[in-house]
Amino acid sequence: MNIEDIKAVYFVGAGGIGMSAIARYFLKKGLVVAGYDKTPSDLTRQLEKEGMLIHYEENKELIPFACKQKTSCLVIYTPAIPAEHQELKFFRENGFEIQKRAQVLGTLTQAHKGLCVAGTHGKTTTSTMCAHIMHQSHLDCNAFLGGISKNYGTNYILSDSDYVVIEADEFDRSFHWLRPWMSVITSTDPDHLDIYGTKEAYLESFRHYTELIQPGGALIIHRDLEMKEHLQEGVSRYDYSLTEGDFHAENIRIDSGEITFDFISPIENVKDVQLGQPIPINIENGIAAMAMAQLNGCTAEELKYGMQTYGGVDRRFDFKIKTDKLVFLSDYAHHPKEIYQSAKSIRELYKNKHITAIFQPHLYTRTRDFYKDFAEALSQLDEVVLTEIYPAREEPIEGVTSQLIYDNLKPGVKKEMIQKEDVINYVKTHQFEVLIVLGAGDLDNQVPQISKVLNSK
């Protein structure tokens, strides 16, 4: 089906952050956009306000008429939806065009110059930074992001630009559908081993991804990664890191809550870059974003302005309260390396404060595979409160609970295990200097209430 033949789009799994960006793209195009999701959320309610038709019952009879016309309706589904899902079965049995989200993005990277950001972690922030730099520059861009940009209040940007910035998701090998013009790879720490099986298979998936970069384009890869890329002829290769590589930072200054550095580049150095969201880990993310934007023609002034005005991403080191007496923030970190970096950054920012984390582990398989790494990362903090595991798409695994992490926290770390339903009461009955909520599950739904409780103290 050609994209110009599509009159309606139906999403099986409408409420995911990545799916909603594509839904908004088609809504802007004036198409009929509808879908199913398991439960209502702030995001699905917002999509409904924007004109999307969403229902929350697995029932093919609720599919709108316009989405039952197989010659003009594109069906998009998320891999998290089980194969036996009634609505998905209906579309398959009736010969509809059915694509994964990544296939749709792949089509867009063939119609535009795709600037893609892949990696186990850092990809949402880096892609959102790059999109903001590009969008406010003379180049402009479209963008499909994995988080809500605080600059734009949405997870996509639509323009007439030839560029499209895309967060390249390695889950289920989805990023193999993409055909990047350029790509950043931030990290390759093993994850999704329920899908990949082994670390070697995970790394091989990234290696294959590098083969997909189009001749004339470029790979910008973190210099510390284990993987060996395999590039087509005509693809340039650059590396980056915090203090070494083709692109890196020098003269880093962290003072009074501000972060400034010099951007070192083989094209043109840029002095006194100021981070609009002053978090230490964002220096390295910013280097990668600036590198890709600069390679495509952004000027030094545009790079500086983009970085200075970057406002961050919802749930990525997202400050909710920031006073002299109390700091409260939420962070989507759910892989041990992400937890480590978040804990390290918050420790650097608040060296003399007592830091408490409430962590909801995400997935039984991830907890089983990395519980020791989670414990080590969390042990940088003073106090750790663990809730039960958020299962997402998984069934329970015998013997795999948050207790595994709890038992491996280092001596000296104050620790507690509570039920998710008891989090608000816990916050009411304890005092905090710095409190961070960590995880990719549904504990984030309680963040507004936590903020309210803390503000009332």
Predicted regions and their residues:
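Conserved N-terminal Rossmann-fold NAD(P)-binding element of oxidoreductases
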Residues: 10-14, 438
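Phosphate-binding loop of NTP-binding sites
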Residues: 25-31, 48, 61-68, 79-223, ...
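Nucleotide phosphate-binding/pyrophosphate-handling subdomain across enzymes
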Residues: 2-8, 18, 25, 29, ...
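Short amphipathic alpha-helix with an adjacent loop that forms part of the alpha/beta core around
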Residues: 1, 59-72, 423-430
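N-terminal beta-loop-helix "entrance" segment that forms/cooperates
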Residues: 36-55, 150-154
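Beta-strand->loop->alpha-helix junctions that form or flank phosphate-binding loops
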Residues: 36-37, 55-60, 99-106, 144-145, ...
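C-terminal helical cap/extension that packs against the catalytic core
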Residues: 50, 236, 375-433
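Short internal beta-strands
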Residues: 31-38, 219-223, 356-359, 381-391
